[in-house]
């Protein structure tokens, strides 16, 4: 089966997508931490998420994310999917399409 190529419009949309929105769609469980008070950007939020048996604490600011436990981050839904699911770009793109993102 041949995979559909990712066009620039789709890639730009995924890069600009809010990390919090992408996290909610990708993770099996995601809950915002209402007690979190950001120090740098007032728009930052902290999320507790589960993917399979793995637990994450993710800071989200617009399309950017930072995994506080694994000390890794990135920007955009593709990077987030690759990080959370330990998959490559092609599988991340297919998964994002499946989720309707």
Task: Tell me what each language-model feature is.
Residues 1-101:
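N-terminal structured subdomain of primase-like DNA metabolism proteins
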